[in-house]
Amino acid sequence: RHDIAAVRVVPRPGDAPMTLDTVHVDLYFFLDVDLVLLNVEVTANHLPLETAQELMYRFGRAYPAGWDPRGQALHCLAQAEWLDAQGQVLAASDANQRDAFLAQVSSRRAPRISAHWDFLMRPLVGDHSDHPGLLRFRQIEYYRMPQMAYLAMDRPRDLTRSDFVRLGLVTGSGARDPAGGCALPYGEQHLAEFESKYCYDRFWTEGGAAPNTRYLCNGHAMVVVGDASSQFYACRDRGVLAQFRHQHFLVFLIAHFQKAALLMYSDRLAETLKNLDISDPASVRHFKRAIRSGFASFLRFTHRYWFHEVAEQAQSRALFRMCSEHLGLDALHGEVKTRVS
């Protein structure tokens, strides 16, 4: 889409509005698999670390997780507005309209997508919504959208362990003590293996073209933190920024496509079983045809899209492995394969 130039957001109630520039909004389709992945890239400069953490935590949520006693939506942006090139509002979030969300869950047994994301998906419309449209979609993955974040810091070595944990696990900001420190979001025992599980520290060193560069990956999110003063780190043509936007983006996209496809095949099988009436010969015949079709489709997916290595480069290979392991792709593939066959 080319009509969206920016997004104006209020991270938490009482925060000042801020405007993020929109780099691009794309919808990715895949051959022979009925999946689409939405890709939205936004950018901003000179943000405090706490603001960046809150934006990462709140931005990509398809709908609110709940509401507080005052009716304020929880864990998502307090307000979001898509803007055109003239600054006019194209669509705004409706997260605080609690009754509308609960009404759809009550009547359709399916969540309601927030208005600003619903607008972004047009001309596709939600399958459970009342909007007319031939092209319809259903949410198949978690309501917290997968995200990537590129952070150029003034002094990345000054970040505390708590800062990295909050960035890597996307937990939002925490209260600062008088010395400027911040408590860990989870217990120390739970985070004992954080560095070995979630950090890729090959370039976390004072030397090299992009010194003090650390990658963090938990499957749901991939984050890179580096030195803003490094020319190579900030280079959008050949440096870390270019690699992150193109090469590492594809690594992350492939991993989440594989997960979404496996979830889709599992969902289709469940729908097929739900519609089976063993006392009706026509229903049994339809069931057999659907099972054969599903098996053939899964076989094509396995041969065309299922692989464990996506690059020869050691860094990309390692990042893809981290994504796959945290998403549990091998176990999910084995489970779906057993059910389909």
Task: Identify the function of each model-found stretch.
Residues F244-S341:
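Membrane-associated alpha-helical segments
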Residues R12-D277:
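Extended alpha-helical interaction modules
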Residues A6-R12:
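Short beta-strand segments that buttress and anchor functional surface loops
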Residues R1-I4:
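Long, charged/polar, low-complexity intrinsically disordered N-terminal extensions
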